[in-house]
Regions:
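Extracellular beta-sheet/turn segments enriched in Thr/Pro/Gly and aliphatic residues
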Residues: 1-10
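Outer-membrane beta-barrel proteins, especially TonB-dependent receptors
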Residues: 5-6, 15-32, 36-40, 59-67, ...
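Active-site-adjacent helical/loop segments in soluble small-molecule enzymes
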Residues: 49
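A short linear hydrophobic-aromatic micro-motif
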Residues: 54-58
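Strand-loop-strand
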Residues: 628-629, 637
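Gly/Thr-rich phosphate-binding loop signature of adenosyl cofactor/nucleotide-binding cores
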Residues: 651-653
Length: 697
């Protein structure tokens, strides 16, 4: 949320030119602190940050979420974890982010293409997942976290142990999470919504005066069942896939996702600045089982090698410079009976240089330029439904840039301005898809002739801070040439290659197309704190996404988030320092108190009706508005002035409202013949209990 903006301004942002104070960043940035992450009830890390202004999630059930920033997602958002870009075949609706949420300490969200460090796919922005920082010299700590959610019986635990002895640092953790089917007022328990998640992480390294060198190994396993949404034609009830809808075991059909990551992170301190080099290897194995739990129909195996070399200078005469090169090599293959995309190889690289300049006490200027090149080659494997060859080769390249300024008008007002040019090469799914997606309930067809996307985005922000009120306004205008999107192409007609495939007769067919688009929107927030212990925070997000020069029914871009207003009244019942401040100063009274950092909060999330839809060929439908009431509380338990546990309680959808989010893929499942309602609804009332036990060794 937007509260306590003055203290938040002192935080350091890493996703721009080196490490920069938030108050000096010209582009829009949101930061999610460790305390907010721990206190937020969620099923995955993207779900946890989806409450941030301008951020949404595309969901398939309770376990799969994809980040959407200002109406843009998929390969337009780069997710960074362990210092490398997360590569998990993110082109699919039902392909989430393969990162253990318990391993994430804080999150940076960069909105728009202003940061030049991340390349082609960062047109919409970047989500940077920061893991726990290394401990100070001589420290050893452990951490035990346990969580339970009532709606889907989610049970999770997380074990972590870390230390720093004579500069040798380590951090080991293991997480396990399981959930049975979730329920709502209209559908009851939803068959196929159960999942199981396991993850492990090990970091070994050295921290010295010359810098650091760390090796990280991470593994992530997710087994979500697939919600098909099929109904009994007589009763309208969802057809159960097993006799026990509260089982934690998998049921057909289901996915099995395994993601492995090895990262070597190095930083060398120099007299003039520092040099950073990160090399990463990832393997993503994604299987779908439809008829038998022992025989997969689809099996994608993706190998990714990433590299990043960066040099950042110390500040001199108000200047700070950064330059670098980075890129990746990918090899993807199909090992299943069914194909969605052809085998392919990809190689890309990018060169960039950025600069910031402090002008007096009021102005901070920054700018930069980047060049990207990408080569992609698809190999023969199957015949494409639209008659195109399934083997092709494409090359893409472009220059991009950004320029911005921050003006500290006075002690109360801060003005931010930024203009950025973005670029994105079409991904392999957009160019070469030809198959049914069991998890997204459709058949998809690519177009190898698609052009790259180019964007021009302008941002204007104004921050106000006073003793009792803080407010922020962020405006943006984004023009995208050759915007790529999916649209429904109707029933099968012989010779056209579109509609219903003979190989998937029950699946509607969607084809990739493109057109020029413009997106306008804003995020606004205000926090009232008439007394120190009370905060009334409000945030509103809006984006209008239109296709230019389009016919009626195709005017609006498909799957644009609905306008969202979030409000929270929070009462802090005991003294504490703000969670984002590194050093906590505790009073004698706080040392004597059994409960510290005690708070109670009431929240309301209102999503307005989304009537701006791509209605041609029933690509999408309007979504009614709804409001969700929540209640939360939390506290630290202290004994003899030492924190021994943290407790969190959250009740989401307190009134058990039946609703469908506009970005839920389950909204387009089968219609209930009895009620006339289409699709599967989101989760009903859900109460979460979480306990965190820190242990100092």
């Amino acid at each position: 949320m937007f509260y306590r903006h003055l203290q938040l301004n002192e935080l350091t942002v890493t996703g721009v030119t080196g490490d920069t104070k938030l108050k000096h960043v010209t582009a829009p940035v949101s930061i999610v602190s460790p305390q907010v992450l721990r206190a937020t009830a969620s099923t995955n890390v993207i779900d946890a940050i989806s409450h941030q202004p301008g951020v949404s999630q595309l969901t398939t059930g309770g376990s799969i979420s994809k980040p959407i920033i200002r109406g843009l997602g998929y390969n337009r958002v780069v997710v960074m974890s362990e210092g490398v870009r997360q590569e998990g075949q993110q082109w699919g609706d039902e392909h989430g982010v393969e990162v253990d949420g318990n391993s994430v300490n804080s999150v940076e969200i960069l909105k728009g293409p202003a940061s030049l460090m991340y390349g082609s796919d960062a047109m919409a922005g970047v989500v940077i997942l920061h893991q726990q920082p290394t401990l100070a010299e001589g420290e050893m700590k452990a951490n035990v976290t346990s969580e339970y959610q009532t709606n889907n019986g989610l049970f999770a635990y997380h074990l972590q142990m870390a230390g720093n002895q004579n500069g040798f640092v380590w951090d080991a953790s293991f997480s396990d999470k399981m959930a049975h089917a979730y329920k709502n007022k209209y559908d009851g328990y939803v068959p196929g919504s159960q999942f199981r998640e396991r993850a492990g992480r090990l970091m070994l390294g050295v921290n010295k005066g010359w810098g650091h060198s760390r090796l990280v190994w991470a593994i992530y396993h997710l087994t979500p069942s697939i919600i098909e949404g099929e109904r009994d034609p007589k009763t309208g009830e969802l057809e159960p896939l097993s006799n026990d809808l509260k089982t934690y075991g998998r049921s057909l059909p289901f996915q099995q996702v395994k993601h492995y990551k090895l990262v070597w992170d190095n930083s060398l301190n120099l007299s003039s600045g520092y040099l950073k080099a990160i090399i990463g290897y990832q393997q993503n194995r994604r299987q779908e089982f439809e008829e038998s739990p022992d025989e997969y129909e689809t099996f994608f195996k993706l190998h990714t090698l990433t590299y990043d070399l960066r040099y950042v200078t110390n500040e001199f005469d108000g200047w700070k410079l950064s330059t670098g090169i980075g890129g990746m090599y990918q090899k993807s293959g199909n090992e299943g009976e069914e194909y969605l995309i052809p085998d392919y190889r990809l190689f890309d690289f990018g060169l960039y240089a950025t600069a910031t300049k402090q002008l007096g006490d009021r102005w901070m200027l920054n700018g930069g330029v980047r060049y990207d090149h990408r080569h992609l080659k698809a190999f023969p494997g199957f015949s494409m439904l639209n008659g195109q060859e399934d083997n092709f080769s494409r090359n893409f390249g472009a220059f991009t840039g950004s320029v911005g300024a921050v003006c500290n008008i006075n002690e109360h007002f801060n003005l931010r301005m930024n203009l950025a040019r973005g670029f994105r090469a079409p991904n392999l799914s957009e160019l070469g898809s030809n198959g049914k997606h069991e998890g997204s309930l459709r058949y998809e067809i690519g177009d190898k002739g698609l052009k790259p996307e180019y964007s021009l985005q302008a941002d204007l922000g104004l921050d106000f801070t006073s003793r009792y009120v803080s407010a922020q306004l962020a405006l943006f205008a984004n023009r995208i040439d050759n915007y790529v999107f999916l649209h429904h192409v109707g029933d099968y007609t012989e010779g056209t290659g579109y509609g219903y495939s003979v190989y998937a007769p029950t699946y509607p067919v969607y084809a990739y197309t493109q057109g020029d688009a413009r997106l306008l929107g804003f995020e606004a927030g205000v926090d009232f704190h008439p007394i120190h212990s009370v905060h009334f925070s409000n945030a509103f997000s809006y984006v209008d996404a239109q296709q230019m020069h389009a016919a009626p029914g195709t005017k609006y871009l498909p799957f644009t988030p609905a306008p969202k207003w979030s409000s929270e009244l929070k009462w802090e019942l005991s003294h504490h320092s703000h969670p984002t401040i590194a050093h906590h100063h505790t009073t004698d009274a706080a040392h004597r108190s059994l409960l510290n950092n005690l708070y109670v909060a009431v929240g309301l999330d209102c999503l307005l009706k989304q009537s701006h839809i791509y209605g041609a060929d029933d690509t999408e439908t309007e979504t009614p508005g709804y409001a969700l009431l929540s209640l939360s509380a939390g506290t630290d338990l202290q004994l003899h002035g030492k924190k021994v546990a943290e407790f969190y309680f959250t009740a989401d959808n307190l009134l058990d409202k039946a609703y469908q989010n506009h970005l839920s893929r389950l909204k387009y499942a089968d219609e209930n013949a009895v009620t006339g309602r289409r699709g599967v609804y989101n989760m009903g009332r859900n109460i979460t209990f979480k306990v965190v036990i820190p242990i100092t060794l």
